[in-house]
Structures are given as structure tokens and as C-alpha cells.
From Swiss-Prot:
Protein keywords: Chloroplast, Plastid, Ribonucleoprotein, Ribosomal protein, RNA-binding, rRNA-binding
Origin organism lineage: Eukaryota, Rhodophyta, Bangiophyceae, Bangiales, Bangiaceae
Function, in words: With S4 and S5 plays an important role in translational accuracy. Located at the interface of the 30S and 50S subunits.
Protein name: Small ribosomal subunit protein uS12c
GO BP terms, alphabetized: translation
Quaternary structure annotation from Swiss-Prot or TrEMBL: Part of the 30S ribosomal subunit.
């Protein structure tokens, strides 16, 4: 426990929490342009071809973002919206593409959890 005199001399250190998505810079989402769209393989126990995109953000960062859902229309120079949220089995992928906004179309024929994939309500 410091004395009052020690606290007068130098105040207490603030604890700075390290952000998990620095490229967003405290914004909920960021817009960016895809520089490369490709597939990559996950870490050890899992096996798949995960769809990811390299995105140059308006904040100046270049990040790797996961493209969720079955099928996508994203290609190079597509303008996409990025949100936070990592993919546990893809190292270095800390962002998600928001489906159904800007150039990223919603998932076709999606019935459940539609709001997460930018799909409109089907006609009965």
C-alpha cells in the first residue's frame, strides 16, 4: 500500500485493456476493399477449406476476414463491411465479413438464423 506522499509524487497506473480487434479502432464495423479472396485450411484437428478475404480497411489496416455462410459473391475490389469476431481454428483471422451489406450478398436459401447471414424473409 503506498503512502499519501508516494501517491502525490506519482499517481496510480491505469490498467490498459488490450483490444482483440485493433483494426476497428473502437468502431462497431469498418468498410474495406478486398485485395485477395482465397481459401485456407484450419488448425490441426479440423479439416476444411475456409473462405477468407484480405481486406484493406478505411482505417488503413490490412486484415484477413472470414466469409461466413454457404457460397459467396465476393471477389477482388469488392467493397465489404467488417465486424469483429475471431475464427478459432484459423490463426490470424480476427474479423468477419458482414453478409447482406455493400457488395456482400446474403446467403441464398437460408431459412434459419437469417439475420446473421443477411437473408431476406422467404415468401411463405
Amino acid at each position: 500500500m503506498p503512502t499519501i506522499q508516494q501517491l502525490v509524487r506519482s499517481e496510480r497506473r491505469k490498467i490498459h485493456k488490450k483490444t482483440k480487434s485493433p483494426a476497428l479502432q473502437s468502431c462497431p464495423q469498418r468498410r474495406g476493399v478486398c485485395t485477395r479472396v482465397y481459401t485456407t485450411t484450419p488448425k490441426k484437428p479440423n479439416s476444411a477449406l475456409r473462405k477468407v478475404a484480405r481486406v484493406r480497411l478505411t482505417s488503413g489496416f490490412e486484415v484477413t476476414a472470414y466469409i461466413p455462410g454457404v457460397g459467396h459473391n465476393i471477389q477482388e475490389h469488392s467493397v465489404v463491411l467488417i465486424r469483429g469476431g475471431r475464427i478459432k481454428d484459423l490463426p490470424g483471422v480476427r474479423y468477419h465479413v458482414v453478409r447482406g451489406t455493400l457488395d456482400a450478398a446474403g446467403v441464398k436459401d437460408r431459412r434459419k438464423s437469417r439475420s446473421k447471414y443477411g437473408t431476406k424473409k422467404p415468401k411463405s
